[in-house]
Amino acid sequence: GRTGHEVGKLAADILAKLLTVARRSRIHVDGIGVCIPGIVYSQTNRVWAPNIPGWDNYPLYEELRSVTPPGIEIYIDSDRTCYMYGEMWQGAAKECHSAIFIAVGTGIGAGIIIDGHVLHGANDIIGATGWMALQPPYREEYDACGCFEYYASGNGIGARVRDAVRANKSYKGKLRQKPICRISAYDVFSAYNEKDPIAISVLHKAVEMWGMASANLVSLL
């Protein structure tokens, strides 16, 4: 997959094409909103996305600014915060005073509304729930993803199943039908629908973790 500048260039190329379409269609653009799967440092507009190699203090704003005409503002925020804004605007959190949105994908994050405001927190890190330690002992060898993410994110579910298939030499189920290194969360859900025992075990644990995290987060409101 793409890393570092390759991802930034791809985003800039897509933005340039969209701006060209808007110009040719005589669509006026006031601003551009971008959400990223990580943290945006508001003082510098640089970003950190742990699941994108090379995006540590990455100058995404400068990359996008280079293809954007003067006068058009660029706003970058975390995906979890943007999800929450969307729910406030047109979704389940419309007119809500306090709410939490848990986003499960490659990683895990949470958008949080308190007193009608979407929170950003110290260093814009609020809602980075993937590092929540929900089960002892905390697995330091997975600190790149975090305890909660290891058990219940897309990447984590795939990693847990790969570990389980490697460890169980007698296992002959559906997940053995492809190279272990290529097993993804998609494969796990597919195997779950066919009652695969490893998929069932891993996904039941993920559901348990989602429930625990939801209960803990709600208690903060």
State what each model feature region is.
Residues 1-12, 16, 20-32, 38-98:
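Glycine-rich phosphate-binding loop and adjoining helix at the ATP-binding site
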Residues 1-4, 68, 73-75, 89-205, ...:
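Glycine/GP-enriched mid-protein hinge/lid loop-to-helix segment characteristic of carbohydrate kinases
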Residues 20-27, 167-173, 216-221:
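Surface-exposed helix-capping loop/turn segments at secondary-structure junctions
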Residues 34, 157, 210:
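Residue-level signal for inorganic ion chemistry
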Residues 42, 113, 220:
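Short, acidic, Ser/Thr-enriched surface-loop or helix-capping motifs
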